[in-house]
Amino acid sequence: MDDVAAAAHTSKTAVYRHFADRTQLYIAVCERVAQVLVGQVRVAMDGATDPQAKAAAAIAAYLRLIENDPEVYRFVVHRPLVDRTLGADLVADLVSLIGDQVADVIADQLAAAGADPAPAVPWGHGLVGMVRSAADNWIARPSGMSKDELADHLTALAWTGLSRVAARIKEDAS
């Protein structure tokens, strides 16, 4: 809490007026990050015109949030020493929420193409897991790769897989 107070340019007493302990602070930060991240990913996807652009926009939005505030990302993802009597895993909840939203977009695209939308859920969650894992590595072990380069690489991998498997499903349905 000393570090939080110092970063906020206030006293520890002022921080404790708003948060009883580090766990409550962690929960509040997670909730705010979830709100911002889900909003930014959704806006990015909604602003894209085709499925590949939607994937690229979502990946770029996620990486942009990390690049803009890597310390907040580390704080949320790597869970500081908090009281683990929490009933839920807030990071897993956030990842599931984003996975569900990506799955919804994929399902809509599959249905519009006349294909079965059933694979959308595992594909959406798989994509989110891939991006999160690559982002964790990118932030933990910087290699000089820019956010844009990483986004391009992840989009290429995701789109190659999605476009081929979607085409196969459509062929099987014919």
Predicted regions and their residues:
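Short, hydrophobic secondary-structure boundary micro-motifs
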Residues: 74-77, 85, 170-171
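Helix-turn-helix
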Residues: 1-24, 28
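Charged, amphipathic alpha-helical coiled-coil/dimerization segments
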Residues: 68-74, 107
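Alpha-helical structural segments
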Residues: 7, 24-47, 53-64, 75, ...
